[in-house]
Amino acid sequence: MTALEVTLSGADVLLPDVGLSRANLTIADGQVQQDPAGPQVDLSGYTVLPGIVDLHGDGFERHIAPRRGAMKQMDEGILSVEAELAANGITTAVLAQFYSWEGGVRGPAFASQVFDAIAAVKGSVVTDLIPQLRFETHMLDDYAGLPERIARWQVPYVVFNDHLPHGRLAQSRTPPRLTGQALKAGRSPETHLEMLQTMHARRGEVPAALEVLCSDLADLGIRLGSHDDATAEARAWWRARGVSVAEFPETLDAAEAARTAGDYIILGSPNVVRGGSHKGNASALDLIAMGLCDALASDYHYPSPRRAALMLTKSGLLDLAGAWALISSGPAKVLGLTDRGALAPGKRADLVILNAENHRVVATMAGGRVSYMSGDIAARFIT
């Protein structure tokens, strides 16, 4: 695929070690270049920023399973996802797919379809799509052969969840939303409850099984993360097993434990935009103010990373460079992607162009190729 060769002029560009500055930016051969090349495009009135790297997002579910039913052509759903990602300035996206006892669009069979669809379209899309597996730790019967399946699905990133309602199950009480969950999974409420009770009863077997699984995945070079750590002890347990990414820690104690040990801390950008967690967990704003955040992720809402970075800047909590790093260079570092996250010579030409007045996304490029362009800016490139 052909990348643009062009010099962008007249815009305010976020440059490393400089900050926002009126500067020319040349892209060619899919990278940011040191020397001018190609035709010059006047971008006066616009702001050019590094492309957004989204570490964790499951907002794609509505594209591939509208109205509770999977699309017949899953590939088309992934293409629709890419369009939304690009329209929100996202140039690298981790698509977080559940592998869960919840079944339906979060069940193992559906996960396999999603990963196959991502692999099928990966070579024909502009946005870099990275699959992530969110594995429910108490699915003990699914451990056998899981590393091999993950390798076959070309999944480089696995995160561990435990969403079992242990409190209710320990009290022999019916979990909330049981009937709705069961119907989505295609089970009777009685069968679904029995399955939950069985997994809860076998919880003592989970740590040993996870020891082996984490070791096997690490041997494959898989990046490992834990989801919703609630205590410092939980974070330490995961770290001891090579799980170095803490996604959405629920408490200050868990986040501080991660920072002290040098683990990566990922927070949800909707938490920033909302001004707090919708579940009553630790406030992302508070954690960011304390330096307990390496990256912000879209979580369930793709417009939120950009909005969160701009809100952090407007509030004065961070300058633009620091805020934007949480959605560009920060997440790139977590993923080990040293070729992106900053508009520097030799880096991938991943960038998002905003209208300087209202901060809306008007164009997105990944690897020097246009993934999104809308409105009057298109005329500037055409002419």
Name the predicted role of every residue range.
Residues A11, D29-G30, S329, K333-V334, ...:
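C-terminal cap of metal-dependent C-N hydrolases
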Residues G51-L55, A93-L95, L129-L133, P156-D162, ...:
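Hydrophobic faces of well-ordered beta-strands that scaffold small-molecule active sites
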Residues S100-D229:
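Metal-coordinating catalytic core of metallo-dependent amide/deamination hydrolases
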Residues L43-V114:
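Metal-associated gating/positioning segment near the N- to mid-region
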Residues R152-P156, W238-V245, T260-I266, M290-D294:
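Glycine-enriched alpha-helix->loop->beta-strand junction motifs that scaffold or abut catalytic
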Residues A261-N271, G275-A356:
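His/Asp/Glu-enriched, well-ordered alpha-helical/loop segment
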Residues L133-A144, D229-A232, W237, V245-E247, ...:
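Active-site glycine- and acidic-residue-rich loops that bind
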Residues M1-L49:
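Histidine-rich, glycine-flanked metal-binding segment
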